[in-house]
Regions:
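Extended ligand-binding regions for polar small-molecule ligands
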Residues: 16-17, 133, 214-247
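Hydrophobic hinge/microswitch elements
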Residues: 82, 86, 146-203
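Basic, amphipathic "hinge/linker" alpha-helix immediately C-terminal to the N-terminal HTH DNA-binding motif
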Residues: 1-18
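N-terminal winged-helix
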Residues: 17, 24, 30-62, 66-68, ...
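Beta->alpha turn/N-cap motifs
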Residues: 73-74, 90-96, 119-120, 184-186, ...
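Flexible hinge/capping segments at coil-to-helix
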Residues: 30-31, 103-114, 118-140, 225-228
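Secondary-structure junction motif
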Residues: 48-51, 92, 138-162, 227-231, ...
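Beta-alpha-beta core module
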Residues: 99-107, 112, 176-223
Length: 256
């Protein structure tokens, strides 16, 4: 695009954002709510499996504050957080470990091992817990590095750690389309239990031992009013979960 087109886009974008904020302000006013926080989650995640608890706990403490939640692809979440269109985002753990988040804070809120998803006719389908070395015999359906480089590099580094390079057979445009590209019995893709396709009736999911995945919360240094309170709620929920695990003798999932 030309410079004129870029400038026009920025002007229109600013106007649209201002219009959306005005509509949101009016909605909050009509509903008796004075403030709002904007939260971003992954469109490929079952975000309700962790976010619902935080939202309920926050509303109990701050009933006058509305929470606006939107789901997007990882790269869109990153961009919106940097441009202050979102106050806090929840993304995958490997984003924290492979992306430079200068000027941001990150915190792990959910821990779980990686999961391998496969067809029902996969030769290793009866193996209940996989090892990384089992991936050596598989064809990996990845996400294109053009769209999500952190996913690609994470899997390559994981396999190289165990002495082999992954056999990549396809690069999908996004996480949602990986399941539709399991075309042969040896085709698999890697995710974790928060992925929307985990537990799907169309694929078999197995944990991969000695691996670490999960969900991280990311926010900028410039803290909006009530963001600190929301972060505290998330931390308290996590602390309560850890205490329950200790009392019930349960180990962290990633150690299983």
């Amino acid at each position: 695009p030309t410079e004129a087109a870029k400038n026009l886009y920025q002007v229109w974008k600013k106007m649209i954002v201002e219009m959306q904020e005005a509509v949101e302000d009016a909605r909050r006013y009509m509903g008796g709510r004075s403030e709002s926080l904007k939260i971003g989650v992954l469109d490929s995640h079952k975000s309700e499996s962790y976010l619902w608890e935080y939202v309920e706990a926050f509303h109990d403490l701050y009933p006058d504050i509305s929470l606006a939640v939107e789901s997007e692809r990882p790269e869109v979440l990153h961009k919106k957080l940097m441009e202050n269109e979102l106050d806090v985002i929840f993304t995958v753990r490997y984003d924290m470990e492979t992306i430079s988040w200068t000027g941001h804070h990150m915190e792990l809120v959910k821990e779980t091992p990686f999961t391998v998803c496969m067809r029902a006719d996969n030769p290793l389908v009866d193996k209940q817990v996989w090892e990384v070395k089992d991936l050596k015999e598989c064809n990996l359906v990845m996400i294109s590095a053009l769209h999500l480089p952190s996913y690609n590099s994470m899997i390559v580094e994981l396999c190289l750690k165990y002495g082999f390079f992954p056999n990549i057979v396809y690069n999908a445009q996004n996480a949602a389309s990986q399941i539709y590209n399991l075309l042969k019995e040896n085709d698999v893709f890697i995710c974790d239990k928060y992925h929307k396709d985990y537990g799907s009736s169309h694929v078999i999911s197995r944990p991969i031992k000695n691996t670490k995945s999960g969900v991280v919360m990311v926010w900028k240094n410039e803290r909006k009013k009530y963001l600190c309170q929301f972060i505290d709620v998330v931390r308290n929920c996590r602390q309560h979960e850890q205490q329950e695990n200790i009392q019930n003798g349960r180990m962290p999932e990633e150690e299983k």
